[in-house]
Amino acid sequence: MTSDVIANMITSIRNANLRKIKVIELPATKITKSIGKILLQEGFIDNLREREENNKNFLILTLRSQRRKHKASITTIRRISKPGLRIYSNHQEIPKVLGGIGIVILSTSQGIMSDRQARQNRIGGEILCYIW
């Protein structure tokens, strides 16, 4: 297991999209569960489940097919803030991805949330990734 669970999750999703794999399994942590819930709320994934095997928890993501043009699917996912270079933003400077089509996932003092929720709550935080 890698030390950067966010980068591991992003890389797994990106590789699954390139290989057209529909279901991926990731190590379950609080951060990956929170990011998975945001992806489910925003419509980028179809399903989110948790499975336990030998006292280890796994998160199972069912990715949305890109063939459905009327539904959101992940075309690009990019890690922004890295362990070696943290990127922070206040609520006024949170970037809009593709004019609001994509989302920004932030880690705030109130938990991990999307850019829309952070602007609505008027809080900033660390920019984790861009998704569109």
UniProtKB/Swiss-Prot annotation:
One of its GO terms (molecular function) is structural constituent of ribosome. The keyword Aminoacyl-tRNA synthetase does not apply. Pfam families: Ribosomal_S8. GO terms for cellular component: chloroplast; ribonucleoprotein complex; ribosome. HAMAP family: Ribosomal_uS8_B. It comes from Chaetosphaeridium globosum. One of the primary rRNA binding proteins, it binds directly to 16S rRNA central domain where it helps coordinate assembly of the platform of the 30S subunit. SUPFAM superfamilies: Ribosomal protein S8. It is found in: Plastid, Chloroplast. Belongs to the universal ribosomal protein uS8 family. InterPro entries: Ribosomal_uS8 (IPR000630), Ribosomal_uS8_CS (IPR047863), Ribosomal_uS8_sf (IPR035987). This is Small ribosomal subunit protein uS8c. Transmembrane segments: none annotated. GO terms for biological process: translation. Part of the 30S ribosomal subunit. Keywords: Chloroplast, Plastid, Ribonucleoprotein, Ribosomal protein, RNA-binding, rRNA-binding.
